[in-house]
Amino acid sequence: MKTVEVRVAGPPDLPKINKLIDMAVMNWPMPTRLKRLASPILQYDLVDLGFLKVFVATFNGQVVGVAAWDIATLQVLPNEAGGLFHGLYVLPLIQGQGVGKKLMSTVFDDARCHQVNGLLIKAQRVSKNYFAHQGIQALSMDEGDYPYKYWKALA
């Protein structure tokens, strides 16, 4: 989608961001009850905007994608320290058209500007193939809260 614009999100964007997250989660291949319970937990609020850098992708003034990273907290990894890629959601109807890739590039560029040498991505099972397809390095699986983790080196 060539006319998609990416910008930093602000408080007025939160209702649209959370509606988009809800639509994306409801499209996940899992039981409806689980999706209904998971969606509110994944949504952002004003407190999140205080410590996350959130970007929105817009098309004709509508929010069609969102990505966020934790600008304050450094994640310690075996050989590196970096930030946390917090979330990536794209309107289900336009997935596969480059919106997610554009949002990720924006997050990666912003992290580089903040001299972060890499980002840890904790992926849900439904999105693990997406990050692998993007060529992002998979880390070894574990039994923790997110068994699918990826490392995007930025340095």
Residue map of PLM features:
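A short beta-loop-alpha structural element at the N-terminal edge
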Residues: 4-19
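Conserved GNAT-fold acetyl-CoA-binding loop/helix
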Residues: 22-44
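A short helix-loop-beta-strand connector motif used in the catalytic cores of GNAT acetyltransferases and
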Residues: 44-56, 84
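Conserved beta-strand in the GNAT
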Residues: 56, 62-71, 84, 89
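Conserved acetyl-CoA binding element of GNAT-fold acetyltransferases
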Residues: 78-92, 148
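Conserved acetyl-CoA pyrophosphate-binding loop and the N-cap/start of the following alpha-helix
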Residues: 94, 98-106
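Conserved GNAT acetyl-CoA-binding A-motif
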Residues: 104, 111-124
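Conserved active-site alpha-helix within GNAT-family acetyltransferase domains
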Residues: 113, 125-149
